[in-house]
């Protein structure tokens, strides 16, 4: 049992508590409310007095490569792109994530409790993302959802990767055609399997969760025309999809709104070091959100460092995103987009006890994470300011 008392609780459900408490038992939130309704806790061993500091859901990174692209390890620590063939749906991020990567500690120090992690964008089909918690030593024990999405990529990255090898795709036409062919073949396989007309095929089995609507396509798209191509193909096959990066999304807001697909915007803190990201700007998230599009914000770690995710949200707020939407973009919105909002993203009874305590607004640069909790377990405390949090 863990009890947090005297917290300024922001639940992300619309119901907040100026002086509230939370109880977590066996990893799940069991009670939340005003301090006036708090059960006796004096004889409990695990009590955190938040002393009026902000208590909110653990922050969520909606798209990154932590543990797959490690820091300062060169080729040995880079397992992000199997860039020798363009279609690799059978690759699983879970088989490449190293929980010992320094990014996991950085995430905990920033109040980030979970992340969507997967392959890079060198391939037309890159493989399967996994949604994980950010604390642990065995990746199998950190999994929330696997597979969680199927990575596809449009534009500059697959073009540059394969055009120099004298193999397709060398053009945007080929990228779209190859993806269509793969989906066509996977759909045909699904129908044959349903009628017991073929043997199992490992490659096409990987597509069944996508074709059955259990997980979305996760589309790497920057340029407006690439965003529209992704939408076109997903609609042709009746698939769900997230628009990741969406750097020129603000130029085609109506079309994205009509598609019904959510946007994962970023990494806007990165440099415009590619041709297709010349219109990348922090204003994109606000413009899309104001149009009624569900928005999450990403660092695309290690493109931007994962610990700067709350600051990226703050810069989006500075550029027009509503303040409450800034917090939603790193909590409940990514949870919904990633299909895990039944477990994380808000503070509600029955959900995982993933909680972050801050000494201010996490979107402000001087704010510190005082305590990070995953499934009721304290996984980080800021010792330099431990006097602000009593652990009795």
Give residue ranges: language-model regions:
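C-terminal cap of metal-dependent C-N hydrolases
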Residues: 5-11, 17, 336, 348-392
């Amino acid at each position: 049992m863990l009890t947090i008392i005297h917290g300024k609780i922001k639940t992300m459900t619309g119901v907040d508590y100026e002086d509230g408490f939370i109880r977590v038992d066996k990893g799940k939130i069991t009670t939340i409310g005003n301090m006036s309704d708090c059960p006796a806790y004096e004889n409990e061993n695990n009590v955190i007095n938040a002393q009026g500091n902000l208590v909110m859901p653990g922050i969520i990174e909606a798209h990154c490569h932590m543990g797959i692209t490690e820091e300062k390890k060169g080729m040995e620590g880079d397992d992000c792109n199997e860039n020798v063939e363009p279609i690799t749906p059978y690759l699983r991020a879970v088989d490449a994530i190293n929980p010992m990567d320094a990014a996991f500690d950085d995430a905990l120090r920033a109040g980030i409790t979970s992340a969507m992690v997967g392959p890079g964008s060198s391939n037309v089909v890159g493989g399967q993302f996994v949604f994980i918690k950010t604390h642990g030593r065995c990746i199998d024990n950190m999994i929330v959802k696997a597979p969680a999405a199927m990575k596809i990529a449009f534009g500059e990255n697959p073009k540059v990767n394969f055009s120099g090898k004298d193999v397709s795709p060398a053009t945007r036409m080929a990228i779209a055609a190859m993806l269509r062919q793969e989906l066509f073949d996977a759909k045909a396989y699904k129908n044959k399997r349903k009628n017991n007309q073929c043997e199992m095929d490992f490659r096409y089995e990987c597509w069944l969760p996508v074709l059955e609507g259990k997980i979305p396509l996760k589309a790497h798209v920057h340029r407006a025309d690439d965003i529209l191509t992704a939408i076109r193909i997903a609609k042709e096959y009746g698939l769900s999809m997230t628009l990741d990066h969406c750097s020129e999304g603000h130029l085609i807001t109506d079309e994205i709104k009509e598609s019904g697909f959510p946007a994962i915007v970023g990494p806007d803190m990165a440099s415009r070091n590619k041709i297709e990201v010349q219109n990348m700007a922090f204003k994109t998230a606000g413009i899309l959100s104001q149009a009624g599009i569900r928005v999450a914000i990403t660092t695309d770690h290690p493109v931007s460092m994962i610990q700067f995710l709350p600051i990226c949200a703050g810069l989006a707020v500075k550029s027009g995103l509503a303040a409450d939407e800034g917090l939603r973009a790193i909590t409940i919105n990514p949870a919904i987009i990633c299909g895990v909002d039944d477990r994380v993203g808000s503070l509600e009874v029955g959900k995982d006890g993933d909680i972050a305590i801050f000494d201010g607004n996490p979107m402000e640069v001087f704010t510190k994470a005082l305590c990070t909790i995953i499934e009721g377990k304290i996984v980080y405390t800021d010792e330099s300011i431990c006097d602000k949090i009593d652990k009795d």
